[in-house]
Amino acid sequence: MSDPVFVAFASQKGGSGKSTLTALTASYLHYVEGVDVLVVDCDSRQYTQKDYRDHDIVVINETPALKKAFMNFYKRFDKQPYEILYATPATAIEQAEEYMKDYPAPKVVFFDITGTINDMDLVNLLAQMHYLFIPITTDTGDMKSSIRFANKVMSEMIAPGGSSIKEIKLVWNRIPSRKKSKLCELIDNYLEELQLSSLNTVLSNSARYSKDDGGMAARPTIFRSTMMPPDKQLLKDSDLPELVRELREIINV
């Protein structure tokens, strides 16, 4: 069996959507496409993936329609919910390796990472990733932070060699439409000057990516879940399948 691919959604600061992207892509791969995944949450200040999992458990247990959908799904799905490990940048790799000694190795290990390039523990963790995906939004502050972070990784880690990083891509997230705007295209041109590039697929600024109806709607639905696949109706025009398809082409799984 081939070694797992280490994939990180990373940013210097919160708010760019890296945790949501981690949960969405991990869940789509695992629950829709049947690819075994492991998630390692490395942001010990808040552990967003834990919040997501805890929320999912409560919503599913307290919403009869979702509980029924959950039980029906696992009658035909021959895997368990993917595991989420909670670590620090210093311990993340060791914890993932220890887990894989006791359980079958996943195809992909997703790392949810936040921190500055000046943190040596974070630098050492990033250096062991195979692929990095950095969310970027049209907010000026977030955009500058994402570009600065990606440029530092490229110039100080990838270009000199010595890291395991094979490729780095920025991911346009929370933009006004499903197509790249003129601003996105302008920034993409600037990224080329830095030897960087973004994915072709973009995610629009839609509420479906960050929350669920839970028991509040007449027909309870769930899109971002760590325990179930996204609702099929909500998948329409979400561009999540396209994002995962492009990601799979890059990481070769």
Language-model-detected regions and their locations in the chain:
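P-loop/Walker-type NTP enzyme "switch/lid" segment
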Residues: 10-16, 31-109
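Extreme N-terminal, non-catalytic leader segments
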Residues: 1-11
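C-terminal boundary of histidine-terminating zinc-finger modules
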Residues: 211-241
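Active-site signature of alpha/beta-hydrolase-fold catalytic machinery across serine-
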Residues: 24-28
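Inter-motif core of Ras-like GTPase G domains
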Residues: 120-140
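Conserved C-terminal guanine-recognition region of P-loop GTPase G domains, centered on the G4
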Residues: 146-162
